[in-house]
A protein has these predicted regions:
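Mg2+-dependent phosphoryl-transfer enzymes with acidic/Ser/Thr/Gly-rich catalytic loops
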Residues: 1-4, 22, 181
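Non-catalytic pre-domain segments flanking phosphatase-related domains
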Residues: 1-7, 30, 34
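Asp-based phosphoryl-transfer active-site loop
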Residues: 3-18
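Short, basic/glycine-rich phosphate-binding loops at helix/coil junctions
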Residues: 6-7, 72-74, 141, 173-175
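Short alpha-helical
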Residues: 20, 48-49, 157
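Active-site phosphate-binding/coordination module
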Residues: 24-121
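Conserved acidic, metal-coordinating active-site core of Asp-based
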Residues: 102-103, 107-181
Length: 181
């Protein structure tokens, strides 16, 4: 029987205060891995912005990833599961965000882009999460590709407004300024 441990990144493995993995956590994961336990990352982050696990990756402690809230899962270079958002729903979200004048992050299998970035994108993704700068693209360019996750910077009221146009999508919030879809 295979035994596995699953860990979130932000606030679980990586401290919100230090933006690092505590040495005691690294030692515990090394001990678990040495006993044959598999270690998986389970996160809302897309692969393109997992930039804070090098201390574990350098030690080959991570056996696989469940990213984008389960929409993209992989072990090494092998994709185990991928669930793209239907193109008509991606276009509906893009049109909604463009009309409202709010940013939206679009995540593909290997790339990430943002449309209409503002100070909130900078504050949350660059300053708080220490994500590298995300390329800015037009809504037309963002919707021309296969999208696995969208992060619109919309209120809960706006979420209710767009919800009928994205019926196959699951919506999650961990911060009031945006939703992971």
């Amino acid at each position: 029987m295979t035994k596995a441990l699953f860990f979130d990144i932000d606030g679980t493995l990586v401290s919100f205060e230090t933006h690092r993995i505590p040495s005691s956590t690294i030692e515990a994961l090394e001990a678990a891995h040495a006993k044959g336990l598999k270690i998986f990352i389970a996160t809302g982050r897309p692969k393109a912005i997992i930039n804070n696990l090098s201390e574990l990756q350098d030690r080959n402690l991570i056996d696989g990833y469940i990213t984008m809230n389960g929409a993209y899962c992989f072990v090494g270079e092998e994709v185990i599961y991928k669930s793209a958002i239907p193109q008509e729903e991606v276009k509906a979200m893009a049109a909604f965000c463009e009309k409202k004048g709010v940013p939206c992050i679009f995540v593909e299998e290997h790339n990430i882009s943002v449309c209409q970035p503002n100070d909130m994108v900078k504050k949350i993704f660059y300053d708080f999460l220490h994500v590298n700068v995300i390329p800015t693209v037009s809504f037309e360019e963002a919707t021309s590709k296969e999208v696995i996750q969208m992060t619109p910077f919309i209120t809960e009221e706006e979420e209710k407004e767009i919800r009928p146009s994205i019926p196959t999508c699951e919506v999650g919030r961990w911060f009031p300024a945006f939703a992971d879809i």
